[in-house]
A protein has these predicted regions:
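S-adenosyl-L-methionine-dependent methyltransferase catalytic core, i.e., the SAM/SAH-binding region
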Residues: 1-176
Length: 176
């Protein structure tokens, strides 16, 4: 933890990135070219990577507008070495295939800030059921659970949620 504090100014970040030192160690041998941060979030890892090597360039990708706006401010001192891309990471490699990519970082999952912000609809304490990583997407979780058929919900829970009792869960949702 002490080493972590020395390498990262905690006051600058609303979220502490996981495995920070380990991630920096993985990328320390990259001296030129681009690193893609597929899930930039609040730029904890990105900031560390840019500080660690003054010649590496970064492509910062995220689908969350709020996270990207924060990251742009946070990485302002590195603006000549950073490109921002709004979108899901699924097409990022194709979009930047002509760049000299030397490394890829993907911190997959929901950020604790998304969970903590009640208006995002990820928390059990939220008043609305939203759960959109990209707030510009039209389809939210409330629409899914309130308008999809029992068969459609069963398929979602079985295929994506890997829920054993998927039929029971879908039935309870449709009944209520």
């Amino acid at each position: 933890y002490t080493n972590f504090n020395k390498r990262l100014n905690l006051q600058d970040i609303p979220h502490i990135p996981v495995l920070y030192n380990e991630i920096l160690d993985c990328f320390k041998e990259i001296k030129t070219g681009y690193i893609i941060d597929c899930t930039t979030g609040y730029a904890g890892h990105s900031s560390g990577l840019l500080n660690q090597n003054s010649s590496v360039q970064l492509i910062c990708n995220d689908q969350d507008d709020e996270a990207l706006e924060f990251s742009k401010k946070r990485l302002k001192d590195f603006e000549k070495r950073v490109e921002f891309n709004k979108g899901n990471f699924e097409d990022i490699i194709k979009k930047f295939e002509d760049y000299p990519i030397r490394g890829i970082l993907a911190d997959i999952g929901v950020s604790s800030l998304q969970l903590d912000k009640l208006d995002r609809g990820f928390s059990f304490n939220s008043k609305n059921l939203d759960m959109r990583m990209n707030q510009n997407q039209i389809l939210d979780a409330s629409t899914v659970v309130n308008s999809y058929s029992q068969v459609e919900l069963e398929n979602i829970f079985k295929e994506y949620g890997e829920i054993r009792e998927y039929k029971k869960v879908a039935s309870l949702i449709v009944q209520n």
